[in-house]
Amino acid sequence: MSYGREDTTIEPDFIEPDAPLAASGGVADNIGGTMQNSGSRGTLDETVLQTLKRDVVEINSRLKQVVYPHFPSFFSPSDDGIGAADNDISANCDLWAPLAFIILYSLFVSHARSLFSSLFVSSWFILLVMALHLRLTKPHQRVSLISYISISGYCLFPQVLNALVSQILLPLAYHIGKQNRWIVRVLSLVKLVVMALCLMWSVAAVSWVTKSKTIIEIYPLALCLFGMAWLSTIL
């Protein structure tokens, strides 16, 4: 039994004449260039050291916006500067720096004891309370709750310095001169002065960047920050 030739012939796929092979090469080149450009902007091909360095630089730049320059201008802030800084900060919020500050604060105050977990949870709770207060007292501002948590977390940087001085540096000086009663009194006075300065710094920063000007807006924030400052002083 024989079959016709057309029964065993497989026709080739039809290729449109207006789709030249060179076009496919151009598309491939474009795709490759796009992938190369996106890969150069990614973080998968960089080392851990480069990633940490980039994160530290970004945290430092946000500290300049939130904390560094605003302490002298607390009593006479500029509305234009506040608006520009607020828009930039609320648009680029992160929780890496607040997490790092809370970990450092808890380590300094607890001395890596079992108190660390309580301080860690309490610090996040304080940040949440501050963020909720800002969100409720400023309903007209288009700032999310996460942004307020991030801003409040950056304002904990002076409290980290307070914990470092009160719990690490001053105790070392105390052990060196503990035989002299005057040195002990001076160190206690220095601890209170450092606590007051860092508390004013934190309150000034969070008030400036969130445009909080009335007592109703500032007092709860100052009370939360005072609790953290007092814990790092007495523990």
Swiss-Prot record:
GO biological process entries: endoplasmic reticulum to Golgi vesicle-mediated transport
GO cellular component: a single term: Golgi apparatus
Assigned keywords, A-Z: Golgi apparatus, Membrane, Transmembrane, Transmembrane helix
Compartments, record wording: Golgi apparatus membrane
Main location: Golgi
Top-level division of the source organism's lineage: Eukaryota
Record membrane topology: Multi-pass membrane protein
InterPro entries reported in the protein's UniProt record: Yip1/4-like
GO molecular function: identical protein binding; small GTPase binding
Segments crossing the lipid bilayer: 89-109, 114-134, 145-165, 186-206, 215-235
Matches recorded under PANTHER family: GOLGI MEMBRANE PROTEIN YIP1, PROTEIN YIPF6
Family the UniProt entry places it in: Belongs to the YIP1 family.
Known function: May be involved in proper membrane localization of Rab GTPases.
Subunit structure: Interacts with TVP18, TVP23, YIP1 and YIP5. Interacts with SEC4, YPT1, YPT6, YPT7, YPT10, YPT11, YPT31, YPT32 and YPT52; These proteins are all Rab GTPases.
Protein name: Protein YIP4
Organism taxonomic ancestry: Eukaryota, Fungi, Dikarya, Ascomycota, Saccharomycotina
